[in-house]
């Protein structure tokens, strides 16, 4: 049972920030002011000095000060949350964020940000008169997490963690079989959280076995999502494209280098192959964390950071973990028709490094093309090493965050062998930091104007702003608060909205003073309208989703 702490909701106080924010006219206040006594009572629940971690069986929300790269101190918590500012009356639903939240187990400390065991954070909003917010966090009980807690050390292979090699020849052979079959790879689903079209909610990362169902109300782990097809494979995209009717993803083939483009209908557990895209360079597929789609096409990226079978089978860390950086192998972008499975374009492009794609759309006419936007690191994989936990903790305030931009590919559909890669927006507009983008989902696969990202206010060693980028007017606006690390800004459209940026942006923020809160920005003005405080600090997380409240 989750440990419970009830706090006093204080629905409408002026938001506090280092910047000056005005309430957006589209989102009128409908709640009363909080008293200073209430706020002091809330803050008294957060310890102001270092203490031993609270175990999963402890009561209360006793925690130490937390920074973005420090583990959560208890397995779960649930309670009411105080509101500063005003929630819009239409904001009724639940925001869930997934990400690594536990980097320490027993005496073992993980090496890389991507290693941490998945921690879900939930904030449920009820706007309007009598506004209320409730929150919770909970560890996803994957096989990897349960085994690590039971043994006091990691058992399965994580992003940068290789379990100690077995001593006997027989056990070493067993370890090798486990790696070849994928059984020894993690099922720690610490990347994305997605509402499927049938009401189920899935969390996942890049191993196929990491697809896990959760209960969005309690955050309980329901169990592994069991695919009923025979497609197999060890890895998948961590960011499938999900709509009300389908689930579209890519399955890298490490044996015959290429990718399967597959579709799964809402309500089904069976993936069906749309088509196969062979790789053009290198001995293996490029790392494929995410991809893009248009209304007609799936876009398959092939970058020179490639899966490495040798590194996967090794018992010690390689320079790029499970990958090799092979710029001589070339960089390519492939376009497949979603209805026929036919390849309509396959072009060579300048070297690129992109973990997250933003959106894509089609341009018609005499110069028909597919345009694809991504968070691009100038063809440099240094961002991978930047996310080593020791660097994140020791280099705070140092200007070591690698440069990034909105990279825009233009893929001609006339059979040309080459595509273009340009910068879609002056990188100084967003501090030369760019990652964790979201868009209005109504613009998925279509021409669009706005995206919401984590940018940078330098000097910094990690993205530290929320930034609205305007790809038509070529400008950006940022929210920043000193000492705070925001996670992905997630766009939630106002019901019935017609303007692309009519809604709010939600981000979970970790701060150096040991606090954590959900920040709500007016997406049009990009000004703060509310923050919902947790009684303890929150670790950094990756991606979120929005589940609208059902009508009563």
Swiss-Prot record:
A GO BP entry = carotene catabolic process
Which tissues does it occur in? Highly expressed in panicles, inflorescences and parenchyma cells of the root stele, and at lower levels in shoot apex, leaf buds and xylem parenchyma cells of the stem.
Q: Which organism is it from?
A: Oryza sativa subsp. japonica
- Per the similarity annotation, which family is this? Belongs to the carotenoid oxygenase family.
Q: Looking at the UniProt record for this protein, which Gene Ontology cellular component terms does it annotate, in alphabetical order? A: chloroplast
Q: Which PANTHER family match?
A: BETA-CAROTENE DIOXYGENASE (PTHR10543), CAROTENOID CLEAVAGE DIOXYGENASE 8 HOMOLOG A, CHLOROPLASTIC (PTHR10543:SF94)
| Annotated compartments | Plastid, Chloroplast
Which keywords fit this entry according to its UniProt record? Chloroplast, Dioxygenase, Iron, Metal-binding, Oxidoreductase, Plastid, Transit peptide
Give residue spans, biased composition: Polar residues.
Answer: 59-72
What EC number(s) does its UniProt record assign?
A: 1.13.11.-
Protein name, as recorded: Carotenoid cleavage dioxygenase 8 homolog A, chloroplastic
Cofactor binding summary note = Binds 1 Fe(2+) ion per subunit.
Instruction: Please name one Pfam family that this protein belongs to.
Output: RPE65
Q: What Gene Ontology terms describe what this protein does at the molecular function level?
A: carotenoid dioxygenase activity; metal ion binding
Q: Is Metal-binding a UniProt keyword of this protein?
A: yes
